[in-house]
Design a protein with these regions (language model features):
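Short, internal active-site loops enriched in acidic
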Residues: 32, 68-69, 122-123
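Generic marker of residues within folded, mature protein domains
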Residues: 3, 17, 75-77
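Short, intrinsically disordered low-complexity segments
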Residues: 53-82
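Helix-rich interaction surfaces within compact, conserved domain-sized segments
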Residues: 77-126
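Hydrophobic helical h-region of N-terminal Sec-dependent signal peptides
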Residues: 3-7, 11
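N-terminal secretory signal peptides
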Residues: 12-63
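Intrinsically disordered, low-complexity boundary segments flanking structured domains
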Residues: 12-16, 48-49, 72-74, 101-105
């Protein structure tokens, strides 16, 4: 579960008047499915449309990545293409729930052990 610390942003005053305190979340989605196949572009597009866009209708960014991690079960180093989702939103319990929903949906749909996540307090304006 994503820590409830998202509720209490403690960034110092934002430097630009138009900025406000937000949480920046990066989610890392491995595209290797059980060492047999990759989550294809069409499958990713469908996941983006049916899960991510509906969960974050105010906007998000997706980039391609190239990741490497050690499988805790086998000890094997896995190298795989990935997608990186970037979301910036006001800190809240709702944000925490939305991030967890997207992570859980991806793990279930594509048989993944995990989805990586980094959250940090930032100042942002759109």
């Amino acid at each position: 579960m994503i820590p409830a610390l998202l509720l209490a942003a403690s960034v110092a005053a934002c430097p630009l008047p138009s900025e406000q305190r937000m949480i920046e979340a990066q989610l890392f989605f491995g595209r290797d499915v059980e060492d047999r196949t990759l989550v294809g572009d069409a499958q990713w597009s469908d996941f983006t449309a049916t899960v991510i866009a509906k969960t974050f209708p105010d906007g998000f960014t997706v980039t391609d990545g190239d990741g490497e991690w050690r499988d805790p079960k086998s000890g094997k180093v896995v190298h795989e293409p990935s997608k990186i989702l970037l979301v910036a939103a006001k800190p809240s319990a709702v944000l925490t729930s939305k991030l967890q929903t997207v992570m859980d949906a991806y793990k279930t749909r594509f048989h993944q052990q995990s989805v990586g996540v980094i959250t940090r307090e930032v100042c942002a304006a759109f």
